[in-house]
């Protein structure tokens, strides 16, 4: 199992390119199953979950054609089986996204419940209830969701999401694209990745209005045709490198990104004392060697501050001037990284869903363990500014969401290397 060794104390300085968004690429790949001809998806990030989704298509009898730039062509007409097996989907919650497209396009689907995913405790039940509202007959047995469309296909429906669910919104929107009649999704997720998926579906011929608002209207069509589409840039990767620059007092320009989808994060970085300038597809952050000021953060659904940037801002507050409160309103158990940061000397107190962070001038390198994707990014950021060496274990979590993280940080001057376990 690989590890990262980081020697802190270097101010980041330079330019990097941002990868395509994983959370956009996965639903877009799932949506290719709706097409009745070949579809090309460009700007895919080189990540484990993307590879798993492409491997899943291979198991179904589809033979994706991938080029060296990680553009993939998929022709779903060659599909031979409508089963997404457990051994593939157990590591990837996004596998549930093939459920809606398969039922809508082929009339049935059998998808293993993603690993550790209990019905009711996570919003898988919203996916099921949404499809049932469209007439699908669904059984959950033996760890699989087995779904069939009614005779004549799925029917348009009005559906209200009890809680805002990004993947739930995406799944039902995809299914509704080929349903008979009109569907209206209320309390829908407004994330940019939902809009990106809607734009891809529209490129294939779907009739969708209101993506990016909490009410999405879909008029079902008879067929969706071939298309070529470029995945949007990753806003969380963008934010992570900007925070890394801020924490080290450095200057970073991130290219091939979109400042308009990151406004809540950019405002907080400016509040922390960063000079932020933007262009159409780039953002530059410059701390001019200064130590950041602590900021208060409260996570909430888009367009508010994203939960996936919460851990990175705890790292920022840990070395900032003053005290900042970070309130997590989206997920439980999202402060696992705090206990690893204590090993580096961070002064953080957790009270319920709030982390109160008192900045300290110095963090010390230590052996730490990544616990999940975004928590692992916060440990990397803290290590960049810590005195001495930090050894980060279980970095497969990082590899799930960050393409070539050590190479990109090396381009910015960081002393970081990957070592085999």
From Swiss-Prot:
First-tier enzyme category under EC: transferase
Positions of phosphoenolpyruvate binding: 22-23
EC assignment: 2.5.1.7
Pfam family, one: EPSP_synthase
GO cellular component: cytoplasm
Catalytic site: 117 (proton donor)
Pathway: Cell wall biogenesis; peptidoglycan biosynthesis
UniProt keyword annotation of Oxidoreductase present: no
Residues with PTM 2-(S-cysteinyl)pyruvic acid O-phosphothioketal: 117
Localization, UniProt: Cytoplasm
GO annotation terms (biological process): cell division; cell wall organization; peptidoglycan biosynthetic process; regulation of cell shape; UDP-N-acetylgalactosamine biosynthetic process
GO terms for MF: UDP-N-acetylglucosamine 1-carboxyvinyltransferase activity
Disulphides: none
Keyword Cell wall biogenesis/degradation applies: yes
Keywords: Cell cycle, Cell division, Cell shape, Cell wall biogenesis/degradation, Cytoplasm, Peptidoglycan synthesis, Pyruvate, Transferase
Reactions listed under catalytic activity: phosphoenolpyruvate + UDP-N-acetyl-alpha-D-glucosamine = UDP-N-acetyl-3-O-(1-carboxyvinyl)-alpha-D-glucosamine + phosphate
InterPro entries, per the entry: Enolpyruvate_Tfrase_dom, Enolpyruvate_Tfrase_sf, MurA_subfamily, RNA3'P_cycl/enolpyr_Trfase_a/b, UDP_GlcNAc_COvinyl_MurA
Record-listed UDP-N-acetyl-alpha-D-glucosamine binding positions: 93, 122-126, 308, 330
Role played: Cell wall formation. Adds enolpyruvyl to UDP-N-acetylglucosamine.
Protein family per UniProt: Belongs to the EPSP synthase family. MurA subfamily.
PANTHER family given in the database record: UDP-N-ACETYLGLUCOSAMINE 1-CARBOXYVINYLTRANSFERASE (PTHR43783:SF1)
Protein name as it appears in the record: UDP-N-acetylglucosamine 1-carboxyvinyltransferase
Gene source species: Pseudomonas savastanoi pv. phaseolicola (strain 1448A / Race 6)
């Amino acid at each position: 199992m690989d590890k990262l060794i980081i020697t802190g104390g270097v101010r980041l300085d330079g330019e990097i390119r941002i990868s395509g968004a994983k959370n956009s690429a996965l639903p877009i790949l799932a949506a290719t199953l709706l097409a009745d001809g070949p579809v090309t998806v460009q700007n895919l990030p080189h990540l484990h979950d993307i590879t798993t989704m492409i491997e899943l298509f291979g198991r179904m009898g589809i033979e994706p054609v991938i080029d060296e730039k990680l553009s993939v062509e998929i022709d779903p007409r060659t599909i031979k089986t409508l089963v997404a097996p457990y051994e593939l989907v157990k590591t990837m919650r996004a596998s549930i996204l093939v459920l809606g497209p398969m039922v809508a396009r082929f009339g049935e689907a059998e998808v293993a419940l993603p690993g550790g995913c209990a019905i009711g405790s996570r919003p898988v039940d919203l996916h099921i209830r949404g499809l049932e509202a469209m007439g699908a007959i669904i059984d959950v047995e033996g760890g699989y969701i087995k779904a069939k469309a009614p005779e004549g296909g799925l029917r348009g429906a009005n559906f209200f999401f009890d809680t805002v669910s990004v993947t739930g919104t995406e799944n039902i929107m995809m299914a509704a694209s080929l349903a008979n009649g009109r569907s209206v999704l209320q309390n829908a997720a407004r994330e940019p990745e939902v809009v990106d998926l809607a734009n891809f579906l529209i490129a294939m011929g779907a009739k969708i209005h209101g993506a990016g608002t909490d009410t999405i209207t879909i008029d079902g069509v008879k067929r969706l045709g071939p298309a070529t589409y470029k995945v949007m840039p990753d806003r969380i990767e963008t934010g992570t490198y900007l925070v890394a620059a801020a924490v080290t007092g450095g200057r970073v320009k991130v290219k091939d990104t979109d400042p308009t989808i990151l406004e809540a994060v950019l405002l907080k970085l400016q509040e922390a004392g960063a000079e932020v300038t933007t262009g159409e597809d780039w953002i530059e952050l410059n701390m001019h060697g200064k130590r950041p000021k602590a900021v208060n953060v409260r996570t909430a659904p888009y367009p508010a501050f994203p939960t996936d940037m919460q851990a990175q801002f705890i790292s920022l507050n840990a070395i900032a001037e003053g005290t900042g409160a970070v309130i997590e309103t989206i997920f439980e158990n999202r402060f696992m990284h705090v206990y690893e940061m204590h090993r580096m000397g961070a002064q953080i107190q957790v009270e319920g869903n709030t982390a109160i962070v008192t900045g300290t001038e110095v963090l010390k390198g230590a052996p730490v363990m990544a616990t999940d994707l975004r928590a692992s990014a916060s440990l990397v950021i803290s290590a960049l500014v810590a005195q001495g060496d930090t050894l980060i274990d279980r970095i497969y979590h990082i590899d799930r969401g960050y393409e070539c993280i050590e190479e990109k940080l090396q381009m910015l001057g960081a002393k970081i290397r990957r070592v085999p376990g």
